[in-house]
Swiss-Prot record:
HAMAP family (alphabetical): FlgH (MF_00415)
Record's bilayer topology term: Lipid-anchor
Keywords of the record: Bacterial flagellum, Cell outer membrane, Lipoprotein, Membrane, Palmitate, Signal
Protein family according to the UniProt entry: Belongs to the FlgH family.
Source species of the chain: Pseudomonas putida (strain GB-1)
Localization per Swiss-Prot or TrEMBL: Cell outer membrane; Bacterial flagellum basal body
Gene Ontology process terms (BP): bacterial-type flagellum-dependent cell motility
Protein name: Flagellar L-ring protein
Keyword Membrane: yes
Length: 231
């Protein structure tokens, strides 16, 4: 019996451990800075006034549009969601069965034990009802800024950016990661773009240390709010 309880306890601990979010780790290669590609060798000077590779556009600004360029993304995210759900199911059923003949003949309904004649009539009456209500609300706000690098420039001019920021504090570390697609026209002259203009954005805000651990529920609390709780 004790061995069986130990097996159940170990299985429950493993299931609850799987509910814990993995701790973020630094130096993720996906968010590593992307360096500019090695430039091609410069063409030999042939003595002409206009040399290929030395041109300058008088009307273009210095927006980031090449691989390895730096862009600052201003974070201004605010989301809120609420959901209400209700269900009610009710079912009533009733059946009355009356038999006067059985296989074409009238059966004998005399009660051999006394107390009146037997009856072939039967009846059924049933009622079932189920009612449930649920409500959930959630809100998130994230403000700040993070500087990332251009990882890729697509043929249509869309820029893929990604990067991360780690802040080392006394009791742990704070992490901000972002990846997404930016349109060159949305980049301001100071190489900034709001996060609301980043398409297919993947924004992560997490941390490690005592502050991050304090915001996590304990293993027993996770059991009570998990699908394993039968009530």
């Amino acid at each position: 019996m004790n061995r069986l309880l130990s097996v159940f306890a170990l299985g429950g601990a493993v299931l609850l451990a799987g509910c814990v979010a993995p701790t973020p780790k630094p130096n993720d290669p996906y968010y590593a800075p992307v360096l500019p590609r090695t430039p091609l060798p410069a063409a030999a000077n042939n003595g002409s006034i206009y040399q290929a590779g030395f041109e300058q556009n008088l009307y273009s600004d210095r927006k980031a549009f090449r691989v390895g360029d730096i862009i600052t993304i201003t974070l201004n995210e605010k989301t809120s969601a609420s959901k209400n759900a209700g269900s009610q199911i009710q079912k009533n059923s009733k059946a009355d069965i009356g038999l006067t003949s059985l296989f074409g003949s009238t059966p004998n309904t005399n009660n051999p034990f006394g107390g009146g004649d037997l009856s072939l009539e039967a009846g059924y009456n049933g009622e079932r009802a189920t009612k449930g209500d649920s409500k959930a609300t959630q809100g998130n706000t994230l403000t700040g800024s993070i500087t990332v690098t251009v990882a890729e420039v697509l043929p249509n001019g869309i820029i893929a950016v990604r990067g991360e920021k780690w802040l080392t504090l006394n009791t742990g570390e704070e992490l901000v990661r972002i990846a997404g697609m930016v349109r060159a026209d949305d980049i301001a002259t100071d190489n900034t773009v709001p996060s609301t203009r980043v398409a297919d954005a993947r924004i992560t805000y997490s941390g490690t240390g005592s502050f991050a651990d304090a915001s996590q529920p304990g293993w027993l609390d996770r059991f009570f709010i998990s699908p394993l709780w039968p009530f």
